[in-house]
């Protein structure tokens, strides 16, 4: 039985980790930390966990490091900049680290410091970290000591692009035009649980807004996925615009591709189906169908629809996921399963919630 800790268990990704790991047959949650809720039962903060979890929040204070080194794996569901303060000591003690923030996502120190406004505390460890997207980086995750759990938007974008980029890598000529447009929408839970005027009910209900239009911190992560992890042999110029929509959870990314003459000769539907036929959490819908966010709610599933229009030389890739599960906590548990040699879907076979 793995002994685990969740650092930062009061945010939405933290409570999703508690929900998922409480029913995982191979783990025991040894520590659940929160300075603001220390001493309180988790079920008093989240009544949904009554009868499910008997855990109490702890503020380990000066004993944090010694307590966490008693664990096999530590999940950080904390703001950016927290995990990297503890990661080196934990790894030295043989503890695996899975960070749900951005400390270990970007391999470029320059990109990290530019977009996240932090000086990285352990650049040498960053070089050893694995990007936690199992569908493209499974082998690296298996042997990694540190996982940078992907951002929610990059998960949809990279997995939405993977089959066509890989097909293009095998072709002599480009299959898609250099310009890629990603139009993405997220429920408000993606902005976190903290109180903000822009996130209150009166501001978000019956409202729909774009943000990060001039530049969003997930853009370099998407670019890294395409050009480094997928090793695109053609340069792709990515335009990414996220939006906040009036729903609690869910994410819908629409990816617009221009097709070349060579690209129009291919059956993208067949390419996507073949690419993901063995992936337990990726569902490529039949031709002509459309995904919706409700179909993946509270699950670790990601659904893709491919729409190819050769007469207009274009393709539209539609991708949906739950931003808190496949876009965050579920993916972290999936990575843990890969790291420790468990069945990848263990503890994650939850049926999506409808309605």
From Swiss-Prot:
<dbReference type="Pfam" id="PF01118">
    <property type="entry name" value="Semialdhyde_dh"/>
</dbReference>
<comment type="pathway">
    <text>Amino-acid biosynthesis; L-arginine biosynthesis; N(2)-acetyl-L-ornithine from L-glutamate: step 3/4.</text>
</comment>
<keyword id="KW-0521">NADP</keyword>
<dbReference type="GO" id="GO:0051287">
    <property type="term" value="F:NAD binding"/>
</dbReference>
<dbReference type="GO" id="GO:0006526">
    <property type="term" value="P:L-arginine biosynthetic process"/>
</dbReference>
<comment type="function">
    <text>Catalyzes the NADPH-dependent reduction of N-acetyl-5-glutamyl phosphate to yield N-acetyl-L-glutamate 5-semialdehyde.</text>
</comment>
<keyword id="KW-0028">Amino-acid biosynthesis</keyword>
<dbReference type="Pfam" id="PF22698">
    <property type="entry name" value="Semialdhyde_dhC_1"/>
</dbReference>
<dbReference type="InterPro" id="IPR000534">
    <property type="entry name" value="Semialdehyde_DH_NAD-bd"/>
</dbReference>
<dbReference type="InterPro" id="IPR023013">
    <property type="entry name" value="AGPR_AS"/>
</dbReference>
<keyword id="KW-0055">Arginine biosynthesis</keyword>
<comment type="similarity">
    <text>Belongs to the NAGSA dehydrogenase family. Type 1 subfamily.</text>
</comment>
<dbReference type="GO" id="GO:0070401">
    <property type="term" value="F:NADP+ binding"/>
</dbReference>
<keyword id="KW-0560">Oxidoreductase</keyword>
<protein>
    <recommendedName>
        <fullName>N-acetyl-gamma-glutamyl-phosphate reductase</fullName>
        <ecNumber>1.2.1.38</ecNumber>
    </recommendedName>
</protein>
<dbReference type="InterPro" id="IPR036291">
    <property type="entry name" value="NAD(P)-bd_dom_sf"/>
</dbReference>
<feature type="active site">
    <location>
        <position position="152"/>
    </location>
</feature>
<dbReference type="InterPro" id="IPR000706">
    <property type="entry name" value="AGPR_type-1"/>
</dbReference>
<dbReference type="GO" id="GO:0005737">
    <property type="term" value="C:cytoplasm"/>
</dbReference>
<dbReference type="InterPro" id="IPR050085">
    <property type="entry name" value="NAGSA_dehydrogenase"/>
</dbReference>
<dbReference type="GO" id="GO:0003942">
    <property type="term" value="F:N-acetyl-gamma-glutamyl-phosphate reductase activity"/>
</dbReference>
<keyword id="KW-0963">Cytoplasm</keyword>
């Amino acid at each position: 039985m793995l002994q685990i800790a969740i650092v930062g268990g009061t945010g939405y990704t933290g409570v999703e980790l508690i929900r998922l790991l409480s029913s995982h047959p191979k783990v025991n949650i040894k520590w659940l930390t929160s300075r603001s809720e220390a001493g309180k039962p988790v079920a008093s903060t989240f009544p949904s966990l009554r009868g499910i979890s008997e855990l109490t929040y702890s503020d380990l204070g000066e004993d944090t490091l010694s307590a966490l080194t008693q664990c096999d794996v530590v999940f950080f569901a904390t703001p950016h900049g927290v995990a990297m303060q503890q990661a080196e000591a934990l790894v030295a003690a043989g503890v695996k680290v899975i960070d749900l923030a951005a400390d270990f996502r970007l391999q470029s120190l320059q990109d990290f410091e530019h977009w996240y406004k932090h000086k990285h505390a352990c650049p040498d460890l960053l070089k050893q970290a694995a990007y936690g997207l199992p569908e493209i980086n499974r082998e690296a995750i298996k042997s990694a000591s540190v996982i940078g759990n992907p951002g929610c938007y990059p998960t949809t974008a990279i997995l939405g692009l993977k089959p066509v980029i890989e097909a293009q890598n095998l072709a002599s000529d480009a299959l898609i035009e250099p310009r890629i447009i990603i139009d993405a929408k997220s429920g408000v839970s993606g902005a976190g649980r903290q109180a903000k005027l822009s996130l209150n009910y009166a501001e978000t209900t019956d409202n729909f807004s774009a943000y990060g239009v001039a530049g969003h911190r997930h853009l370099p992560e998407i670019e890294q996925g395409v050009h480094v992890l997928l090793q695109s042999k053609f340069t792709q110029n990515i335009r990414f615009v996220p939006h906040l929509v009036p729903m609690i959870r869910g994410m819908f990314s629409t990816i617009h591709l221009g097709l070349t003459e060579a690209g129009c000769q291919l059956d993208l539907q067949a390419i996507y189906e073949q690419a993901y036929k063995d992936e337990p959490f990726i569902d490529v819908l039949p031709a002509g169908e459309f995904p919706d966010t409700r179909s993946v709610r509270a699950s670790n599933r990601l659904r893709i629809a491919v729409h190819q229009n050769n007469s207009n030389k274009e393709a539209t890739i539609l991708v949906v996921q739950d931003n808190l599960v496949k876009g965050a906590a579920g993916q972290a548990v999936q990575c843990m399963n890969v790291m420790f040699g468990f069945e990848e879907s263990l503890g994650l076979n939850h049926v999506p919630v409808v309605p």
